[in-house]
Amino acid sequence: MGMLRQPGTEHLEVRGAPRPAIPAPPRFNVRGRIVGVDLGGTWVRAALFTPNGLIAQRVTARTQHGSGPQSVVDQIGALVRGVSMSTSGAAMDPMTVAIGVPGPVDPTAGVVHAASNLPGWHEVPLRRLLESKLGCRCLVEHDATLAAIGEQRRGAGRGVANFAYITVSTGIGAGFIIHNRVYRGGTGAAGEFGHVVVAPDGPLCNCGNRGCLDAVASGLAIAREAGASSAVEVAIAAAAGDQLARAVLDAAARHLGLALGGLINLLNLEMIAVGGGVFGAGAKFWDGMVSAVTQGSFERVRRQCRIERAQLGNDQGLVGAFELVMTPEKRAR
């Protein structure tokens, strides 16, 4: 996608062209298999990587919530074993697994503090559970942080030192790279962009507050407000002229854009890459978001920030998992 501008957005660049690659940082000499896992409220993905970072095998399945965290851990264990043993002789090699989880985590302890889209997930010692089940070293990270690492190393954010990735899918999250280093916050909980309150009298969020971005602009919120089964269904209805669907998408895009504008003001970012299933809602949703970014940000700061579509699609978290293992400054422990 080329340069996209709207009236009044002369200093807001929206691009999709690849950026030049930067020299790769030093890497650990990791022997054996590396498996990345991207755990979401709807889907869980696992991929086995080649030593040079290409995906050799992958598997995707609906998240089996079952009786809670243990059901999901059992499912992840089965998926990881499946992809990691798919290559002849691979079972003899050591393995490292890196997993992204949708909620605040302590990456040092490997504990998931909470995950609003994963029922029953409170203070879950995920690293310990996975290491016990798989018998290998495991790293645990916020899913949007892994996606940010993937996009900054090999996607839209290549060469950008101050970068954020925003995912808008089942839920909404953010990952930050500041001065070329992952920013996790004081306790590892940075990135809960979906719980920025944008409508204090709005719908109740899973976290217990009202009017969170998650509750008004996520895929689940869009579908709920329109009485549909998914945000894609809402987008199809909007394209066909359904006025309710159009109004729901317009409101979600505006809330998201205003929140992004505030993020630009706060962090003086060079680039924000956005991705996730909701952007399948079409150009009107994108344009509405971009317009609201302009309204919600300070022009002097905004002119320095590009907004781009993420480039790695559903692989960004998996690629970020590989980079987390292989790149020293991005390791969780």
Predicted regions and their residues:
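A charged helix-plus-loop insertion that forms the helical arch/lid used to bind
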Residues: 110-121
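Short beta-strand segments
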Residues: 38, 98-102, 165-171, 175-177
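Hydrophobic alpha-helical segments and helix pairs
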Residues: 149, 160-168, 175-187
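Adenylate-forming
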Residues: 147-153, 173-176, 195-196
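Short loop/edge segments at beta-strand edges and connector loops
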Residues: 140-142
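ATP-binding/phosphotransfer module of carbohydrate and carboxylate kinases, centering on a glycine-rich
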Residues: 2-96, 105-111, 127-138, 150-160, ...
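Short, intrinsically disordered, charge-biased short linear motifs at domain edges
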Residues: 189-198
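A generic structural motif
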Residues: 61-62, 119, 189
